[in-house]
Amino acid sequence: MNRDRLHLWQDRLARNDSQYENWYTLMDERERLYQGSRYIFPLVNKYRKNNAQTPHVRNICSELIEAQVDSNIPAPKVTAINEKDEELAKIIEDMLRNELDRLPFAEINDLMERIVPIQGGGAYLVEWDNTARTHTTIGELNVVPIHPRQLVPQDGVYSGIEDMDYIILKLPQTREFIYRRYGKDVSFENEAEPDVKGGDGGTAEDMVTQYIAYYRNDAGGIGMYSWVGDVELEDLEDYQARRLRRCAACGELEPTADDGDGEQHALEEEEDTEEPADGVAGRPGLPPDDEDWSGAMRWIDGELWPEEDDKDEEPEDHEARRCPYCGSTEWVYSEEEYEEIWTPITTSLGHRIPGAQEEMYLTGELDELTGLPVPAVRLVPTRVPYYKPLRYPVVLQKNVSVYGQFLGDSDIDKITDQQNTTNRLEKKIIDKLVSSGSFVTLPADASVGVDENDMRVYRPETPADANMIGVFNLEGDVSQDREYLDHVYEEARQIIGITDSFQGRRDSTATSGTAKEFAAAQTAGRLESKRVMRDAAYAALFELMFKFKLAYADEPRAVRTLDERGNAEYKTFDRFDFLKQDASGEWYWNDAFLFTCDTSAPLAANREAMWQ
């Protein structure tokens, strides 16, 4: 473990965390207001107690936030820049629609629809999960919603995540998860920041706080550093690079079980299961995820051994895999820039990638007759560069953009005063009503009990005593309070831009269908900025999902779509369909596509269009 690297990132975390400390406090207050805080802010601290509370809360913060919730997930729209790529654009679009159905986007969207207007923004974390497997595929996309409380952006950079040198995430994890994934024992570490997991903020015995820093490396790629407390978990200079095992002696790649070389396979140890193709493990940048590898652990004869364990500690009866070229049993991991293709590949769209080709070379031996070097022929594979997304795996969604601010504008901040005034008036109205009541007047010498019995007898001595008997009802006048309460509520709605028509309530001001349509259109204009920012975030998310799929989905993936008549149609997303060759013979990956959101939503999903 590199202590200097650990201290460097711990210092960066502490420095940037302190700059956003006031924002974190404000985030907690916003959550309390949304959940219905009874606290009343004092008008003048000198004359009013700071711990005043209302016995009754009309939660206008929650009401106006819930009125804006849209359960419809934006649909992807992919446009090809080149005409010949139209079919590929349609496959990408259908693939993204399938991913929206496979992933729990209904729950993710439901959560983000509340986080974003409450806090002013939220984020999505895109990862490649190699533990998700089927019989024919290895790895799947994974998208996780990130609360702003879990983000530590680089201080002073407000233009966007891609402009930052680094960004740090705080993720609550269990100790067992850390051990399974990284092979590191963190049982002695405590939960450093329990607030990031939400709830009451209490410390859980089995939880720890994992910090993940994504940074821009010197080559322009993405690096990653992760730690828990004082334990380093990962340090990957090129987080999105492929890592394969090579022989420490001769430098040749470790062969897989399906290479087709009988002599080579005879030198390998017998495996119970077939070894899958090279791929990234756990997340992009980790070693190949075969049956011998799981996160930062290795399976050796059915037992899990940490990566950092010394080779001498392996079971005595375990026969190490032997290099078929030099016989060495020592292997090291290396970052690979190119993929070697030995067998020709033909994709579902008919694209053909050539395999190994014959190449003539000089052996170094001299011909006895001519004295010239002896030529020989060898097979040389087609070398294709591995694709890298070169993007931070974090996508930010803002509520409304604000200059000089990392997150957008919060709706809760705009109506905090109105919520406080509402709490104050509710308390005042209740105090008046509770203080009201009935009073009975009797002569001074009267002895009439007050109980539930009727027809009690009282004999006044004089007519004057009889005239003194009476009942007075004292009622507090709350008409002005209620009138102002309605005014404050309407004020809050106007600040956010919510109308009765948008909420589906009876609107007495709209006396015709045209008036209804105009009222809904006004609301749509007020909230248009939020929808634009939402669509922009989803468009960036769709692009990142495609790039991760292009980089790490080694096997062709089935894609279901519908044709013009609504019948099911099945296609294939194959990353090699995006592999192109320029005029000079160099191979490159075609990712030149435009990503937006499809605004042609059905009428039932468009509340503004329902009035048209």
Regions found by a protein language model. Give the residues of each.
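Extended, helix-rich architectural segments
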Residues: 1-327, 331-346, 354-356, 366-370, ...
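Short coil/turn segments at secondary-structure boundaries
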Residues: 77-80, 107-115, 125-130, 432-446, ...
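Short, well-ordered alpha-helical packing segments
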Residues: 93-100, 109, 113, 121-125, ...
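Structured mid-domain segments that build the active-site/substrate or prosthetic-cofactor binding neighborhood
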Residues: 372, 376-521
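Extended amphipathic alpha-helical segments with heptad-repeat/coiled-coil character used for oligomerization
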Residues: 130, 514-612
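Short linear proline/tyrosine/threonine-rich motifs used for host-factor recruitment
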Residues: 224, 304-306, 373-377, 568-572, ...
